[in-house]
Design a protein with these regions (language model features):
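C-terminal catalytic lobe of FAD-dependent flavoproteins
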Residues: 226-252, 270, 325-362
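N-terminal Rossmann-like FAD-binding beta1-loop-alpha1 element of flavoenzymes
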Residues: 1-9, 155-165
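Glycine-rich Rossmann-fold phosphate-binding loop(s) that bind the pyrophosphate
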Residues: 12-13, 150-153, 278
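Beta1/beta-strand and adjacent pyrophosphate-binding region of the FAD-binding site
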Residues: 143-155
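FAD-site-proximal beta/loop scaffold in flavoenzymes
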Residues: 128-144, 227-304
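Glycine-rich flavin
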Residues: 2-143, 171, 176-180, 185-187, ...
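Glycine-rich phosphate/pyrophosphate-binding beta-alpha loops
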Residues: 278-286, 319, 349-354
Length: 362
């Protein structure tokens, strides 16, 4: 719209998608509440007298909702100010230039697919009751006394951090060799050390076998014979693309395990149809989708923008301690460049700001 084009935005839910309503924003609100709880517990060392009386989840929920509501209203106002026509309903591709929604056909010279993702589970493990996804975890009005988290990636690590700060006993089950396994091994090991110090238990190289639930809790078994009991089991094994039943394959778009395959310019190879965000293989990050949306808009406008590789996109896990990275891991760099790679480490424990905040740094 900013580039002078007429735009219709079709959305089956609220504009803002997963990030605003069920992902980044509510999770970060919880993380800030958790950080505040830790600050109260540690306040005496800074000369501040305070008492920690527990977590009021009803108030945490109100705080979360107020943040989401403010951003949602701002986004609605932004779309209105740009004269973007917002159509509520699930669209379905009818052909290379037509989307059907609410019984109406809408035609456009260009179509951008951005249908997002959903919380995945694993075969044989159904979400329900005490077995929850991040969607249900963000709506809980109580703090579990204990939780098992299946998955040691971004989602699992952030919820582990929140619940531990809220007072829960937390155990993470991860099939890969390390927590945050996609990061540099040195970072993963430092994070594991920090989580041990916080009292967060974890089992890596451990594969899930089964889970049952009853009024007393959820009971989890792993393939190596371990058993875990908790109030809830959070399934945090990643997110899957929302592409099924939307007509993508019928018009000739190539899917791989549900993901839309594009070229480096995010074109699907069909007509003037592009795809962005979580439905495109790669990092499932809101700012990646945002960047891709800008790229496609400029591409459609004939501005010939420079294509961006996922390797250049920053990645952050907002646990405690936080992790941030960009570019290759050391392992990836050595595989590509061999002995020409030089590694330099600087321990932030010696940084003045770290000393003031009384954080160890990594």
């Amino acid at each position: 719209a900013q580039l002078g084009m007429k735009v219709a935005l079709i959305d089956g839910d609220k504009v803002g998608g997963t990030c605003l309503h069920r992902g980044c924003i509510p999770t970060k609100a919880y993380l800030h509440a958790a950080e505040t709880a830790e600050a109260v517990r540690e306040s005496a060392r800074f000369g501040v007298s305070s008492t920690f009386n527990g977590i009021d989840m009803a108030q945490v929920g109100k705080y979360r909702d107020s943040v989401i509501s403010g951003l949602y209203k701002g986004l609605q106002g932004l779309l209105k100010s740009r004269n973007v026509e917002v159509i509520s309903g699930w669209g379905r591709l009818a052909d290379a230039n037509t989307i059907e929604v609410n019984g109406t056909s809408i035609r456009g010279r260009h179509i951008v697919l951005a249908t997002g993702s959903y919380s995945r589970s694993i075969p044989g493990l159904d979400i329900g009751g005490r077995i929850i996804s991040s969607d249900q975890a963000l709506q809980m009005d109580w703090v579990p006394s204990s939780a098992v988290i299946l998955g040691g990636g971004v989602i699992g690590l952030e919820f582990a951090s929140v619940w531990r700060s809220f007072g829960a006993e937390v155990t993470i089950i991860e099939a890969l060799p390390h927590l945050a396994n996609n990061e540099d091994e040195a970072i993963s090991k430092q994070l594991e050390r920090a989580y041990r110090k916080r009292g967060i238990k974890f089992h890596t190289n451990t594969r899930f076998a089964s889970a049952t639930q009853d009024d007393g809790g959820v009971h989890v078994a792993t393939e190596d014979g371990k058993a875990f009991d908790a109030d809830v089991l959070l399934v945090a094994v990643g997110r899957g693309p929302v592409t099924e039943g939307l007509g993508y394959e019928q018009v000739g778009i190539t899917l791989d395990r549900g993901f839309v395959i594009t070229d480096e310019r995010l074109h699907t190879g069909v007509g003037n149809i592009y795809a962005v965000g979580d439905i495109v293989p790669g990092l499932q990050l809101a700012h990646r989708g945002f960047m891709q949306g800008i790229f496609v808009a400029e591409e459609i406008a004939g501005m010939n923008p420079v294509a961006q590789a996922d390797i250049n996109i920053p990645r952050v896990t907002f646990c405690e301690p936080e992790i941030a990275s960009v570019g290759m891991t050391e392992k990836q760099a050595r595989e590509k460049f061999g002995d020409r790679v030089r590694t330099v480490e600087y321990n932030l424990a010696g940084n003045g700001k770290s000393s003031i905040l009384a954080t160890s740094g990594i």
